[in-house]
């Protein structure tokens, strides 16, 4: 019974992880709400407020947080964006 529960939880976790980390070439989910409210009101100001992102092969401080520090399309692995 315990083993069955552990296996079920592991499968659910890995399925969720795969769906979250999957590369969506069409960016289907990202395009649903791609523009924030501020960006729709003043697109120039929104561009200035964007956070700096790390380019390819740049250092990223926390690899297990994924692509939070890397620019779009890059992923943080082994402390650098690739």
Swiss-Prot record:
Its main location: secreted. Keywords: Calcium channel impairing toxin, Disulfide bond, Ion channel impairing toxin, Knottin, Neurotoxin, Presynaptic neurotoxin, Secreted, Signal, Toxin, Voltage-gated calcium channel impairing toxin. It comes from the Eukaryota. SUPFAM superfamilies: omega toxin-like. The keyword Transferase does not apply. Coiled coil: none annotated. Residues 23-50 form a propeptide. The presence of a 'disulfide through disulfide knot' structurally defines this protein as a knottin. The cysteine framework is VI/VII (C-C-CC-C-C). Omega-conotoxins act at presynaptic membranes, they bind and block voltage-gated calcium channels (Cav). This is Omega-conotoxin-like TxO6. It comes from Conus textile (Cloth-of-gold cone). The lineage of its organism: Eukaryota, Metazoa, Spiralia, Lophotrochozoa, Mollusca.
């Amino acid at each position: 019974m315990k083993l069955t529960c552990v296996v079920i939880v592991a499968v659910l976790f890995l399925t969720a992880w795969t769906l979250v980390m999957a590369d969506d070439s069409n960016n289907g989910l990202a395009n649903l709400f791609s523009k924030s409210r501020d960006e729709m009101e003043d697109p120039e100001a929104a561009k200035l407020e964007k956070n700096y992102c790390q380019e390819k092969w740049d250092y990223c401080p926390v690899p297990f947080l994924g692509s939070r520090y890397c620019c779009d399309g890059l992923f943080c692995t082994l402390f650098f964006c690739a």
